[in-house]
Each structure stands twice: as structure tokens, then as C-alpha cells.
UniProtKB/Swiss-Prot annotation:
Swiss-Prot/TrEMBL keywords: Developmental protein, Nucleus, Phosphoprotein, Repeat, Repressor, Transcription, Transcription regulation, WD repeat
Compositional bias segments (type: Basic and acidic residues): 1-10
Family the entry assigns: Belongs to the WD repeat ESC family.
Biased amino acid composition, Low complexity: 30-42
InterPro entries in the cross-refs: PcG_WD-repeat, WD40/YVTN_repeat-like_dom_sf, WD40_repeat_CS, WD40_repeat_dom_sf, WD40_rpt
SMART domains in UniProt: WD40
Bias (Acidic residues) ranges: 11-20
Molecular function per GO: enzyme activator activity; identical protein binding; nucleosome binding
Name this polypeptide is given: Polycomb protein esc
GO cellular component, one term: chromatin
WD repeat placement: 71-116, 126-165, 168-208, 214-253, 284-321, 340-379, 388-424
Originating organism: Drosophila virilis (Fruit fly)
Post-translational modifications reported in the UniProt record: Phosphorylated.
Subunit structure: Component of the Esc/E(z) complex, composed of Esc, E(z), Su(z)12, HDAC1/Rpd3, Caf1 and probably Pho. This complex is distinct from the PRC1 complex, which contains many other PcG proteins like Pc, Ph, Psc, Su(z)2. The two complexes however cooperate and interact together during the first 3 hours of development to establish PcG silencing.
Length: 425
């Protein structure tokens, strides 16, 4: 275990909410910097755009608890809760920044407890993203992390060491996501314009998404839908693409990967390359699309335009099966607007039950929307701000029951906020 220490800048206390530290309002290239806006901050007109203002809600949804500062002093780009743990198990999350992945527990009484810190052997590594799974044989928690060097590390948290490394992407990896049901399947999106699907149990690359009609620039964000049979991706080319996994060919490859053994086979695994997405559009955003997640059959995505857009591929009445690869039309359902977030690689958080979204900005503020899946336009928004939170908020994560919200910042700080009402979401 690394000897890294974290500086606790503020111990949790029982002071009144009205103290001055907390306020609530209701209302590609290799030189590209993750702290610069890629274009003018002026928002452009979207095709089919609907103007929508979130409804203000009386009272902030979350209350400040504590924050710590990691001693590497560098940007923390990623944060992820281990939502695979049970309701009565500890609330654990990991951060990704510098060449380290740091694991914390959120005690029920408040505060943050440092559990582990993994330091990559390469001091030049910068982790951008991390994601949780577990060993199917031992049930030990596993943390996958990747970043600048383009190498995926799979870390055994209990042993605090990398047990597997995956090399295939030619450049940096911007995001990792595990399959929601088959937790040995890992998805990675890279600066090399490609997306890869891995089986970390048998150590093979099942599929590569990209090529002829793939992304034309860095892949910045990826996500599985809740059934795990579709992928959405977004990138610097301003495009959003859908890729289907429910075809006979893909299902066969996934099944084959479960039993494949490199030691027993004289041939490498027959990786499939998918050159053509099942849907693609550039009509939603006019800038880098740096975060995308599924919201039921809808998609949530954001760019450097001060709005998260909720949209659906094709017409509102169309099913996915009715979409054609040549069709780029889409329907915008709602927009969730915010202020002062015009740089790229700032990612929103969505709780596992898809009821709360949160996004930070360049001033250290966090916007929280409470969602109604049957009426996305009816979302209620509140703003969280602590006067000591002044750096760009890079990513937000929720605990399994959304009782804890955690975010990470460019000044190496990690912030914990607790839901005001005891009832879980």
C-alpha cells in the first residue's frame, strides 16, 4: 500500500447550514489542453432545439460534509463509486488523478476515510478514468483505471496491485465502463478514435468499434444502456454514435470470449471490427461532446455549451429497431442549462437509479437536477456551493442510494456532500 497521505481541509461539524462556507441557490491533437475551451463560448442554435428552463426547487438537495486534498497536487479527473456493494456494506469510491488511484470510504457518521492508494510505476502516467468490477472467482473488488499512456490497469484493491494490464489502444484512454450485467466485459474509449470491448476474465479484446464510419477524432465518453445491448459514444468530432451488441455475430463473440484460452489456442482471439455505427448524428452539439449517458431509451449528453441535452435517436415514436444507419435525425426532449462551464472534459454524474443528475462548473459550483423519467422536462434544479470550492469540478459520482454525492476538482480536492433527507432515492 502506498504511503500517500491526504490532507483533511475541514473536519465534519454540526454547525448551522447558514454558515458562510455553504450556499444554495435555486434558480486533437497532442497539445489540446483539458483546461481550455475548444471554441468560442457563444452557444449555437441546435437543429430541433427546445428552450427549457429547469424548475427551481426550495432548499438544496445536499448538505456539505467535508473535503480532503490529495498530496500529489494535480488535477483529479475521475471519480467512481463502487455501486456493486450491498446496501449494508460500506460506501466506497475511487478517484483518478496524477499517476494514482485513491480509494476512500464514506463512514455513515460523516467524513472520508482513506483505504488504499495505488501509484502507477510510471511517474508520467496521468489517470483520467476509473471503473469498478469484481473478480468472478474470488469476489475481490477490482478497479480498472486508464489515462495518458493508453494502458488499462486492473487493480486488485485488497492486494493494492495491478493484476492485469491491457494494451491495444494507440493513444490515451479517456473513459472506461463495465457492462451492467456481465462485469467481466470492459469498454474503453480512446484518443486513437476507437472503442474497444475487452473480457478481463480471459484477457482478450472482443471487438473494436471504429474505422470507416467511426469517430473522426478522440472518443471522449462511452456508456452501456441498462440492458447492456447497446453502446453510445461521443467525441471531439461533435458526433454521437450508437452501436448495437444484440446481433447474432456479437453475441457469438462474447460467448466465445468466455471460454477462450490463449494457452490452449494456436491462434489469437478473432476480434471483430465494426466500422459502421447503427446510428450517428452531429445535430445535437456544435462542439466537443465530452460526456454521454443513457437515460432509459433517451440519451443525455453535454458539450462546452452550458447545457445537458436529453434527446432520442430518430422520431419520438420510433423504436430503435426502426432506425436506419443512414438516418441522423433526432428528437430533443429537454435541455438542462447551467453557467460557467465552457471547457471540455467536465463530466456529469447520474445516480444508478437514474433519478438525480449533477454537474460541476469552472467556479466550483454543482448543479443538481432531480429527474422524473416520465417527464424529463419536469426536472427540479438546485445549486450547491461551498466558498472554499473554487476550482473546476471535473466529475461527480453518487453512492448507490444517492445519499452521498462526491466530486473531484482541478486543485486535487475531493468533496463529500450528504443528502438532506434520510430517505434513499
Amino acid at each position: 500500500m502506498s504511503s500517500e497521505k491526504v490532507k483533511n481541509d475541514n473536519e465534519p461539524d454540526d454547525t448551522d447550514d447558514s454558515c458562510g462556507d455553504e450556499s444554495a441557490s435555486f434558480t486533437t491533437n497532442s497539445t489540446t489542453s483539458r483546461s481550455k475551451s475548444p471554441a468560442s463560448s457563444t452557444r449555437s442554435k441546435r437543429r430541433g432545439r427546445r428552450s427549457h428552463k429547469s424548475k427551481p426547487k426550495s432548499g438544496a438537495a445536499y448538505k456539505y460534509d467535508t473535503h480532503v486534498k490529495e498530496n500529489h497536487g494535480a488535477n483529479i479527473f475521475g471519480v467512481s463509486f463502487n455501486t456493486l456493494l450491498g446496501k449494508d456494506e460500506p460506501q466506497v469510491f475511487a478517484t483518478a488523478g496524477s499517476n494514482r488511484c485513491t480509494v476512500y470510504e464514506c463512514p455513515r457518521k460523516g467524513g472520508l476515510t482513506l483505504l488504499h492508494c495505488y501509484a502507477d510505476p510510471d511517474p508520467d502516467e496521468v489517470f483520467y478514468t476509473c471503473a469498478w468490477s469484481y473478480d468472478l472467482k474470488t469476489s475481490a473488488p477490482l478497479l480498472a483505471a486508464a489515462g495518458y499512456r493508453g494502458v488499462i490497469r486492473v487493480i486488485d484493491i485488497e492486494q493494492n496491485e495491478a493484476v492485469d494490464n491491457y494494451i491495444g489502444h494507440g493513444q490515451a484512454i479517456n473513459e472506461l465502463k463495465f457492462h451492467p450485467h456481465k462485469l467481466q466485459l470492459l469498454l474503453s474509449g480512446s484518443k486513437d478514435h476507437a472503442i474497444r470491448l475487452w473480457n478481463i476474465q480471459t484477457h482478450v479484446c472482443i471487438a473494436i468499434f471504429g474505422g470507416v464510419e467511426g469517430h473522426r477524432d478522440e472518443v471522449l465518453s462511452i456508456d452501456f444502456n441498462m440492458r447492456g445491448d447497446r453502446i453510445v459514444s461521443s467525441g471531439m468530432d461533435h458526433s454521437l454514435k450508437l452501436w448495437c451488441l444484440n446481433t447474432q455475430e456479437f453475441q457469438h463473440k462474447i460467448e466465445l470470449s468466455q471460454t477462450f484460452s490463449q494457452e490452449k489456442s494456436t491462434l489469437p482471439f478473432p476480434t471483430i471490427t465494426k466500422h459502421f455505427p447503427d446510428f450517428s448524428t452531429r445535430d445535437i452539439h456544435r462542439n466537443y461532446v465530452d460526456c454521454v449517458q443513457w437515460f432509459g431509451n433517451f440519451v443525455l449528453s453535454k458539450s462546452c455549451e452550458n447545457a445537458i441535452v436529453c434527446w432520442k435517436p430518430g422520431q419520438l415514436h420510433q423504436s430503435f429497431e426502426q432506425l436506419k444507419p443512414s438516418d441522423s435525425s433526432c428528437t430533443i426532449i429537454a435541455e438542462f442549462e447551467y453557467d460557467e462551464c465552457e471547457i471540455w472534459f467536465v463530466r456529469f454524474g447520474f445516480n444508478p437509479w437514474q433519478k438525480v443528475i449533477a454537474l460541476g462548473n469552472q467556479q466550483g459550483k454543482v448543479y443538481v437536477w432531480e429527474m422524473d423519467p416520465s417527464d424529463p422536462e419536469g426536472a427540479h434544479m438546485t445549486t450547491l456551493h461551498n466558498l472554499r470550492s473554487v476550482a473546476t469540478v471535473r466529475q461527480i459520482a453518487f453512492s448507490r442510494d444517492a445519499s452521498v454525492l462526491v466530486y473531484v476538482c482541478d486543485d486535487a480536492t475531493v468533496w463529500r456532500w450528504n443528502r438532506r433527507h434520510a430517505a434513499a432515492i
